[in-house]
Amino acid sequence: MASIAPSLKRAHAPLRKALTASSTIRAFATVPPTSSETTKPKRKSYFKDTTVAEFSDFLATSSPAQPLSPAEAFTLRTAEVGPEGKKRTITRLPEWLKTPIPAGNDNFKSIKKDLRGLGLHTVCEEARCPNISECWGGSDKNAATATIMLMGDTCTRGCRFCSVKTNRKPAALDPHEPENTAEALARWGLGYVVLTSVDRDDLADGGAHHFAETIRRIKQKKPSLLVEALTGDFRGDLDMVKVVAESGLDVYAHNVETVEDLTPYVRDRRATFRQSLSVLKHVKEVKGKEGIITKTSLMLGLGEQEHEVMAALEDLRKADVDVVTFGQYMRPTKRHLKVEKYVTPDEFEMWNKRALDMGFLYCASGPLVRSSYKAGEAFIENVLRKRSGEKAMARGTLAKAVALDSETRSSI
């Protein structure tokens, strides 16, 4: 018995220690917080305290933007917002990212009304594009552009930069959509249209035949309308790429979105950089002799390095891609990837020059440029320049290009 007692004593020691400390714990629980505890600031979160932009940040000022020094360009301004006692610090958008509110001109109103009436969707609205009023309005009626989103508004993929809804089993395809889309576009009097779609991995063909049928209906109703198809990768099924490429479109676009190393982090895991390259390359193999234009787009500001962008451009040229666009990545919501950097206009101009020097037919590069931004003006101007034998340029007006083309044809 004498040998057991010490072991029991050791076994009960932790319990006695806990019981002794319990009164202290209860005492701490009833002590009111001190003044220093009540005034202790809340831990900052990245979204609320660093990246949230106010509505006013998206409005352009009446005065023209002033040139910024390098130090000013990389130092973003902050502001205190909110009621007294609940103030928070936000980072304001750079001046070059501010846009005017949609003015609602006749083209804009007509397009929006018809979309609602025919139950059609546009990526302009679903992806919250900042250029919607400029593209839907157009510099004149024939220069207006619109981007119709086919096959519904719900995607089967979940890319970390995109604000489009996602679901494994979206609604069934609307069999009337090809005809309704063609009817709307013929009515609007546009000069150029971009057709895009959500990814439909739930369909055996990825929606390729639905896409192709829509293009054929459009060309039947209005052969003069230039059609660009911005497609997904069809899970790498090149036969489905061929179906769309042979449907009568003028421009085949597929976006690589970002550099190769960031692709697994930015895009859905079912998409790869090399798979996207194979799509663009196959289009040229199928319809290259007929002069089809291929196009892609990259977002900047996701953390990419300069040498990675150069490597992406080199790969795109090897795939014989004709047109490339660069734009600033803008975070749609707090659930999406954060902006790593706001790229300055000078840097976008640098990439514009480099792309043209590498042999791309055309490059649109700027903070607010999107894959289909001013698609009609960019395409028409540069194809007409090429037709006239003049080197493709990054600047110029649609009117000048049309006049140049008319002079060339009259002299033949």
Swiss-Prot record:
Q: Which cofactor does it need?
A: [4Fe-4S] cluster
The record's listing under NCBIfam families reads: lipA, PRK05481.1, PRK12928.1
Spell out the Gene3D superfamilies in the cross-references: Aldolase class I
Q: What superkingdom does the record give?
A: Eukaryota
Q: What is its EC number?
A: 2.8.1.8
Query: Could you tell me which residue ranges the Radical SAM core domain spans?
Result: 138-361
How are cofactors bound according to the entry's free-text note? Binds 2 [4Fe-4S] clusters per subunit. One cluster is coordinated with 3 cysteines and an exchangeable S-adenosyl-L-methionine.
Q: A GO CC term? A: mitochondrion
Protein name (record): Lipoyl synthase, mitochondrial
Entry's localization field: Mitochondrion
